Amino acid sequence: GKNRFTTVVDGDDREYYVHVPESYDPDVPIPVVFMLHGTSGDGLKFYNISGWKELGETENILTIFPSSWRYCIIEDGNTQNITKWNCFPGAFSFCSGETPRDDVKFLRQILTDLGEKFTLDDARVYMVGFSNGGQMATRCSVEMSDVIAAVVESAGSFSNDTLVNPLNKIPV
């Protein structure tokens, strides 16, 4: 069923939702899929609309739906408060005083936290992202390739200036 968790990363409370299938057995390691929402979304909304909690239920997968940070950004000369993943340096023009959050650190912390609560299959940790979440997933394919087996991105991309030097080569 649905679980809401929070963790503290660099002094900020960060939120994520986890669907634990009814068939979960703590004696059997369970595969993990991160689902990263797009711009203006959040973990709860993606939990409700992505269809992955249902897939996780039928396929016995622990599905994770983290929420990105709400930033003040300047886009096309307009200031707006909107959720975005900090997918690569220089991706957005932040308002004065806004501090980009370390989302890779956040996603790693989720794995650590959940590893203390559940029996995770460390060889089957995957990440799926849509739009800005897809951009974040591609960043993680480089910076988290030591803990992620594969990444799927939809409607996202690598930054043009991304240095692709992954810790391990994984399918993207």
PLM region spans:
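A domain-start/cap signature at the N-terminus of enzymes
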Residues: 1-32, 44-45, 50, 55-58, ...
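A short beta-to-alpha transition loop/helix N-cap that caps and shapes the active-site region
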Residues: 71-75, 158-164
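Alpha/beta-hydrolase active-site loop
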Residues: 89-119, 139
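Catalytic His-Asp charge-relay segment
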Residues: 169-172
